[in-house]
Amino acid sequence: MERSLLPEPPLAMALLGPRFEAQTGGNRSVLDNVLPDMAPLVNPYWSRFAPMDPTMSKILGLFTLVILIISCCGNGVVVYIFGGTKSLRTPANLLVLNLAFSDFCMMASQSPVMIINFYYETWVLGPLWCDIYAACGSLFGCVSIWSMCMIAFDRYNVIVKGINGTPMTIKTSIMKIAFIWMMAVFWTIMPLIGWSSYVPEGNLTACSIDYMTRQWNPRSYLITYSLFVYYTPLFMICYSYWFIIATVAAHEKAMRDQAKKMNVKSLRSSEDCDKSAENKLAKVALTTISLWFMAWTPYLIICYFGLFKIDGLTPLTTIWGATFAKTSAVYNPIVYGISHPKYRLVLKEKCPMCVCGSTDEPKPDAPPSDTETTSEAESKA
C-alpha cells in the first residue's frame, strides 16, 4: 500500500463540516489522513488535534519493534522450556505457561499492526482488522491478568494454608485455565455483538473499545469490563499477597526468635529450605504482577478520562498509553528467567548462550550451617 492511497485533507472537513475549521483554526487535523472506510468510526473529538509529528511516529514504531522482538523471543523461550520439559510441567507452572503464551500472542497480534500504522501515520487496514486488533488486545490482556490472579491464589494456597490447603492438580490447573479463556472470550465478543464497539483511538494508529462516545451503552461496558477485568483481579491479588507477606513475616520472626534462644544464626532445615523456595517464587510472582499493573493502569486512566469527559486527553497520550501497556508482555520472561533456578538449568542445557550468571540449584537435603543467615538461605532458593 502506497502513501498516495491516503485521503486528502478535505475529508476531515467533509466529515465534520464547519466545526472542523472552528476547532482547528484551519490547521491540519489527525483526520486528514483517515481512510474513507474508517471515517464513520472516528470520534469527532479527535478532529481538534494536529497530526502527530512524523518523528514521533518513527520513535513509537521503533520502540514497538524492540519490545516485539524482546517479548516474542522471551515468551517463546518460556513456552518452549516449560512446555517441552516434563519435570517443569507442574500444575503451578501450567499457569506460568498460559501467561507466557498469552503474552506472546499479545505482542504477535498487536505490535506488527501498530508498526504498519505508525509508518502510514493512520489506520490503513480497514474496519475488520480494527475489530480483530482490538479484540486480540482485549482477549490476551484479560487472559494475562487472570493468569496472574490464579498464580497469586496458588502461592496463597501453598504458603498461607500450607498442609491445610488443597494441593493443585494438573486437572485443577487445566480447569482454571479453561475458566480464564472462557471469561476472556466473553468480554472480547461483547463489543462485536453490540455492547459497546471497537473504534480507532487517538492519532488513529490503534483501535480499542469505545471510551469517547457519550452514550450509556459503551459507558456501561467500560465500567463493567474494568470492574471484572481490572478491579476484581486487583482486589484478589492484593488479598492473596497481604496474607502471604504476613505469613512469611511471622515465619521469619519466629525463626529469628528461636535462633536467638538457641544462640545460633539459622534454624533452617531441609523443609525450611523448601519453604524458602516457595517464598522466593511468591516474590517473583508479586514483582511480575506489580509490573503488569504499572503497565496497564495508565491506559485505564486514559479510558476513564474519556469516560468522564476530562479535558487533557490527546492523541499522543492515548498512543503512548497503548504502547506502554504492551510492555507488560516483556517483563514476565525476564523475571522468571532470572529467578527460577530450574528454568535456568534447563535453559542452560538447551541454550547456554541465553543464560547469564550461576545456575546452581539449592540443596535442600543439606541444611545451612549455623553461620548462614536467613537472607543467604533465601537467596539460594
From Swiss-Prot:
PTM annotation, UniProt: Some or all of the Ser/Thr residues present in the C-terminal part may be phosphorylated.
Pfam family, one: 7tm_1
InterPro entries from the UniProt entry: GPCR_opsins, GPCR_Rhodpsn, GPCR_Rhodpsn_7TM, Opsin, Opsin_RH1/RH2, Retinal_BS
UniProt key word Transmembrane helix: yes
N6-(retinylidene)lysine modification, residue list: K326
Keywords for the protein's UniProt record, in alphabetical order: Chromophore, Disulfide bond, G-protein coupled receptor, Glycoprotein, Membrane, Phosphoprotein, Photoreceptor protein, Receptor, Retinal protein, Sensory transduction, Transducer, Transmembrane, Transmembrane helix, Vision
Glycan attachment points: N27
UniProt entry tagged with the keyword Cytoplasm: no
TM region(s), chain numbering: 57-81, 94-119, 134-153, 173-196, 221-248, 284-307, 315-339
Membrane topology annotation: Multi-pass membrane protein
Chain residue ranges for the region called Disordered: 358-381
Cytoplasmic domain ranges by topology: 82-93, 154-172, 249-283, 340-381
Domain of life from the UniProt record: Eukaryota
Single GO molecular function: G protein-coupled photoreceptor activity
Extracellular side, ranges: 1-56, 120-133, 197-220, 308-314
Annotated PROSITE patterns: G_PROTEIN_RECEP_F1_1, G_PROTEIN_RECEP_F1_2, OPSIN
Intrachain S-S bonds: C130-C207
Predominant cellular place of this UniProt entry's protein: membrane
Bias kind Polar residues: ranges: 370-381
Similarity-based family: Belongs to the G-protein coupled receptor 1 family. Opsin subfamily.
Miscellaneous section: Opsin Rh2 is the predominant opsin expressed in the dorsal ocelli.
Record's protein name: Opsin Rh2
Source organism of the structure: Drosophila pseudoobscura pseudoobscura (Fruit fly)
Gene symbol of the encoding locus: Rh2
